[in-house]
């Protein structure tokens, strides 16, 4: 990942989210609902705590979060949704990971197959992660008055592997197992209460460059994937 800033890809993700905020909140609510079925206390349920942090970073209203948890409390069917990871590689080396939460896996698989077939791509083995992706935690927050030197000392001691800077923010990357410790250290040491991004995701370690025309078509394809109600997140290694 050295030499390539994740900021451009992060910015694209945010722009897409802003354009479809209602859809994003719907997907986040589902994620919170599924996580909450395993326990309603985020301090005792790491999956719920992560889902709430992710939702807050995307400006999901507190009422929406509480409503999703309340819905889980009243739902006795804890196996209503299945989490699945799909992957595919298109011509030119553009790879995709699509995570889904579905109450009908056959429908979801059929939809994913149809979408990727239109791109002349076949789905890889379900659950398999292409080698061009790394599973990472990512935390982004406003710089405020915090110096990079002070941040670096705390971050590196608590699992940060990379520290990137933009004009107004810091972006920290860690292994998933260090994510919670790093987030807590930032909150405790610097009294950070709001994060612009706070989640565990798949980051590309190799990027694929395509023509401007093909890039535009692929971005439209990414939007189609995100429009599917069963799709939670779409990750790719397209160099934007």
From Swiss-Prot:
One of its GO terms (cellular component) is cytosol. One of its GO terms (biological process) is regulation of DNA-templated transcription. It holds the Pfam family TACO1_YebC_N. It comes from the Bacteria. It is found in: Cytoplasm. The keyword Cytoplasm applies. InterPro entries: Integrase-like_N (IPR017856), TACO1_YebC-like_2nd/3rd_dom (IPR048300), TACO1_YebC_N (IPR049083), Transcrip_reg_TACO1-like (IPR002876), Transcrip_reg_TACO1-like_dom3 (IPR026564), YebC-like (IPR029072). GO terms for molecular function: DNA binding. This is Probable transcriptional regulatory protein MS53_0373. Keywords: Cytoplasm, DNA-binding, Transcription, Transcription regulation.
């Amino acid at each position: 990942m050295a030499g390539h800033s994740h900021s451009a890809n992060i910015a694209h993700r945010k722009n897409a989210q802003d354009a479809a905020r209602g859809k994003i909140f719907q997907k986040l609510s589902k994620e919170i609902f599924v996580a909450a079925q395993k326990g309603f206390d985020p301090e005792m349920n790491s999956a719920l705590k992560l889902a709430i942090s992710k939702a807050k970073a995307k400006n999901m209203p507190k009422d929406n979060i509480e409503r999703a948890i309340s819905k889980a409390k009243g739902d006795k069917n804890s196996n209503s949704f299945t989490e699945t990871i799909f992957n595919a590689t298109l011509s030119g080396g553009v790879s995709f990971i699509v995570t889904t939460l579905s109450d009908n896996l056959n429908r979801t698989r059929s939809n994913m197959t149809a979408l990727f077939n239109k791109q002349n791509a076949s789905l890889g083995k379900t659950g398999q992660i292409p080698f061009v992706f790394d599973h990472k935690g990512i935390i982004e927050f406003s710089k405020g008055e915090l110096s990079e030197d002070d941040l670096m000392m705390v971050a590196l001691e608590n699992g940060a592997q990379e520290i990137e800077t933009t004009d107004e923010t810091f972006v920290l990357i860690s292994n998933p197992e260090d994510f919670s410790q790093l987030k807590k250290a930032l909150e405790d040491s610097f009294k950070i209460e709001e994060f612009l991004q706070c989640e565990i995701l798949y980051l590309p370690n190799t990027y694929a460059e395509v023509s401007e025309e093909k890039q535009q078509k692929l971005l439209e394809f990414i939007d189609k994937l995100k429009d599917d109600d069963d799709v939670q997140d779409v990750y790719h290694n397209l160099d934007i």
